[in-house]
């Protein structure tokens, strides 16, 4: 399954965008694509990544609603939302 270390590593380049807004960097969008490939086809992987994203969002109080738009801004369709309030058990 996906580990929080993998998720954190993928999205670390996005911290500036997530806390300050603007446009995500190329490295950030590469990380989003990497996250997409990690969470591809298996429900347990998607749920694990969801829980990691939820924990990460809670750690960084400055994260704006920009997190929800991150995958869209990078042109990547993620199967896992980046949010503090997602019920990860409902992800299929």
From Swiss-Prot:
Source species, domain of life: Eukaryota
Chain's role: Plant non-specific lipid-transfer proteins transfer phospholipids as well as galactolipids across membranes. May play a role in wax or cutin deposition in the cell walls of expanding epidermal cells and certain secretory tissues.
Organism phylogeny: Eukaryota, Viridiplantae, Streptophyta, Embryophyta, Tracheophyta
Family label: Belongs to the plant LTP family.
Disulphide bridges, residue numbers: 4-52, 14-28, 29-74, 50-88
Recorded GO MF terms: lipid binding
InterPro entries per the UniProt record, alphabetical: Bifun_inhib/LTP/seed_sf, Bifunc_inhib/LTP/seed_store, Plant_nsLTP
GO biological process, one term: lipid transport
SMART domains to which the protein is assigned, alphabetical: AAI
Keywords assigned by UniProt, alphabetized: Allergen, Disulfide bond, Lipid-binding, Transport
Transmembrane feature ranges: none
Keyword ATP-binding: no
Keyword Translocase: no
Protein name per UniProt: Non-specific lipid-transfer protein 2
Tissue: Expressed in seeds and, at very low levels, in pulp of fruit (at protein level).
């Amino acid at each position: 399954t996906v580990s929080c270390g993998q998720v954190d590593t993928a999205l670390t380049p996005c911290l500036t965008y997530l806390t300050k807004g603007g446009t995500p960097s190329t490295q950030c969008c590469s990380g989003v694509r990497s996250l997409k490939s990690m969470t591809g086809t298996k429900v347990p992987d998607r749920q694990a990544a969801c829980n990691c994203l939820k924990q990460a969002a809670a750690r960084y109080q400055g994260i704006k609603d920009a997190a929800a738009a991150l995958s869209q801004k990078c042109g990547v369709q993620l199967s896992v939302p980046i949010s503090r309030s997602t019920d990860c058990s409902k992800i299929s």
